[in-house]
Amino acid sequence: MTTRQPIYKSLYFQVIVAIVIGILIGHFYPDTGKALKPLGDGFIKLIKMVIAPIIFCTVVSGIAGMQSMKSVGKTGGYALLYFEIVSTIALLIGLIVVNVVQPGAGMNIDVSTLDASKIAAYVTAGQDQSIVGFILNVIPNTIVGAFANGDILQVLMFSVIFGFALHRLGAYGKPVLDFIDRFAHVMFNIINMIMKLAPLGAFGAMAFTIGAYGVSSLVQLGQLMICFYITCALFVVFVLGAIARAHGFSIFKLIRYIREELLIVLGTSSSESALPRMLIKMERLGAKKSVVGLVIPTGYSFNLDGTSIYLTMAAVFIAQATNTHMDITHQITLLLVLLLSSKGAAGVTGSGFIVLAATLSAVGHLPVAGLALILGIDRFMSEARALTNLVGNAVATVVVAKWVGELDTDKLQSELASGGSAILETRPEDDLGVAEGPTPGAAVNTTKTV
């Protein structure tokens, strides 16, 4: 029988305290808050440092260990189908809500008076986005370049190809697979060490956000923010909740299960900061490693529900605020463009704003200079985007795993019932809970049976 650790030692509690202190420092000592930005940036860089090798190890180990390669294609096909359906629903919900509530109506902003200099970099980056360019960018110029740049889709593509090739080698490739499994243990132990700094990273990022933008920036455009936050919450509870209920689990229990990851995302405004832990947690939840390795990384570009809601709401808000007429044809065009452009948003801070810039440029009817209206509050809105994205990818993983018959439902219910509270104490073999690698002489195949 294990003893539950004191609450002050839990990451959940530590991150909450860090966020609260960061808000207070940023509000009362804004200059100090802005100076703490390197703490948040440093933490995210530490996480990004190990994301590429972790994705590689997880995907390769999962694919190479599968009995049939048909399962990989089936999983990928179901995942993309789910992503397209749910992200389209998210885009539609954002479009409907912003038309009903009309948060930008009555602002009567003259576009010529807006300072477009601050958004120039975003517009330039957005203009570089194209469908063909996005597809070609998935193919890395070099293997080393994919890992050096940390491009999730490039790393994922190479990992899938490597996994297929390793599977074809059969027993001859087993030493390589054994090495990758052991290397994965090292990477996840590095994550375990980095996560001890999560409260510090959340503290620095939150202090900077409040110090740089201030609470006053929330008041001016508060209606849009409140509308967006409520829409995201309703989407999670009713849309994702209905999907979860239809597949035999509770959305609220799932949220409780990933509460630590949600708090890390809240503090850093980046869903990417929780990616390594999500890979482990979703596997512990009963999803097969091969499914988790494909769905989670792919979802970070193709299943961003919060970003989808944001894109339609922000685009129409700019039209309303600048009195730019948008009839049904314009809005359908916007929706069709977003169905493609939204797939290029990675789970990093600021990517949603770049995609919005690309969308406004592509549509042509909307004033790109209107981006200056929401630049000041985008950082605050990115938190709701990232949280919704994370929950959406967690639901997607469980659903796709169930669709392809790679979900241990008994384990799912058991883990959700426990809330993941004993995750560090009771399983010394788990990657997040150990400080040492596999025991010498032990079996080298670390793929967990589900």
Curated annotation (Swiss-Prot):
One example GO MF annotation: fumarate transmembrane transporter activity
GO biological process terms, semicolon-separated: L-aspartate transmembrane transport
InterPro entries, per the entry: C4_dicarb_transport, Na-dicarboxylate_symporter, Na-dicarboxylate_symporter_CS, Na:dicarbo_symporter_sf
Similarity annotation: Belongs to the dicarboxylate/amino acid:cation symporter (DAACS) (TC 2.A.23) family.
Keyword Protease: no
Regions crossing the membrane: 10-30, 46-66, 78-98, 143-163, 190-210, 224-244, 291-311, 332-352, 354-374
HAMAP family according to UniProt: C4_dicarb_transport
Keywords assigned: Cell inner membrane, Cell membrane, Membrane, Symport, Transmembrane, Transmembrane helix, Transport
NCBIfam families per record: PRK01663.1, PRK13027.1
Segments for region (Disordered): 428-450
Function: Responsible for the transport of dicarboxylates such as succinate, fumarate, and malate from the periplasm across the membrane.
Pfam family, one: SDF
Gene behind the chain: dctA
Major subcellular site: membrane
Membrane topology per record: Multi-pass membrane protein
Cell compartments where the protein resides: Cell inner membrane
Superkingdom of origin organism: Bacteria
GO cellular component: plasma membrane
Name of the protein in question: C4-dicarboxylate transport protein
